[in-house]
């Protein structure tokens, strides 16, 4: 007798209700997701561009295309798309948690700066939150 698979044992069937469902797109910002800004620029200045290639290749060739598909599907179904960004409002990042303030400052992830914006390939659309 065949054993049930692990996935079958721990999966439940469910139905998404578009009017009660939302897609959260979190931290897809230039500060950490753009190879020429923020972290990408910082790594290049430190001479570590090669070590960042894997990260940015995955973001550009896997993560962003899949998020684009999810966004299209959620919008088509009439669901909300909610954009969540993080960073600081204060230029010195004094309003950020102390453990992430240094990377926020180093990547210029400050509200109003281009690094704080969502990457161009995933700009929020009309009706998004």
Model-flagged regions — what are they?
Residues 1-126:
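Active-site acidic carboxylates
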Residues 129:
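Glycine-rich oxoanion-binding loops at beta->alpha junctions
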């Amino acid at each position: 007798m065949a054993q049930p698979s692990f996935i079958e044992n721990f999966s439940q069937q469910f139905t998404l209700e578009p009017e009660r469902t939302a897609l959260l797109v979190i931290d897809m910002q230039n500060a950490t997701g753009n190879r020429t800004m923020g972290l990408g620029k910082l790594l290049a200045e430190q001479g570590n561009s090669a070590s960042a290639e894997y990260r940015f290749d995955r973001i550009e060739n896997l993560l962003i295309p899949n998020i684009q598909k999810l966004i299209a599907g959620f919008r088509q179904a009439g669901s909300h798309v909610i954009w969540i960004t993080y960073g600081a409002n204060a230029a010195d990042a004094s309003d950020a948690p102390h453990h992430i303030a240094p990377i926020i400052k180093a990547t210029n992830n400050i509200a109003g700066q281009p690094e704080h914006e969502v990457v161009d390939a995933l700009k929020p659309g009309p009706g998004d939150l």
